[in-house]
Amino acid sequence: MRILIVTPAPPRSRSGNRVTALRWARLLRGVGHRVDVAEVFERQRCDLLLALHARRSFPSIERYRRLRPTAPLILALTGTDLYGDIHTDPEAAGALDLADRFILLQPHGLGELAP
């Protein structure tokens, strides 16, 4: 499977989102997937979009969903998303609606999502 991981952190950044994206790319490649990491989705060929950070990746999430309405989209919710943005920012909340699945790494993250 060809996977595109979108993270708002630029290449050379040492932010948690970039480190996570690179780590996941390495793990996914290790099990046979073709993986690219980018700051934005710009019509790159991929079978799946995995986006980190709901608010900051929303333009990529929205574009991907518009261009590929049936392709899978996974959203990894960061601490900033869970404990702030998804409750106050319309784009972050919109990203939740567009995703097919979520990845939650925060211990109490599930409690932050509406039932």
Describe every region a protein language model picked out.
Residues 32, 46-47, 99-100:
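Short, well-ordered alpha-helix to beta-strand connector turns
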Residues 31-38:
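A generic structural motif
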Residues 1-12:
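Nucleotide-activated donor-dependent transferases that construct or modify glycoconjugates
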Residues 100-115:
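A short, active-site helix/loop in glycosyltransferases that binds the activated sugar's phosphate group
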Residues 82-100:
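A conserved, positively charged/aromatic
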Residues 39-60:
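Short N-terminal targeting/anchoring amphipathic segment
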Residues 48-50, 64-83, 101-104:
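Active-site proximal beta-strand in glycosyltransferases
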Residues 17-28:
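Short amphipathic alpha-helix
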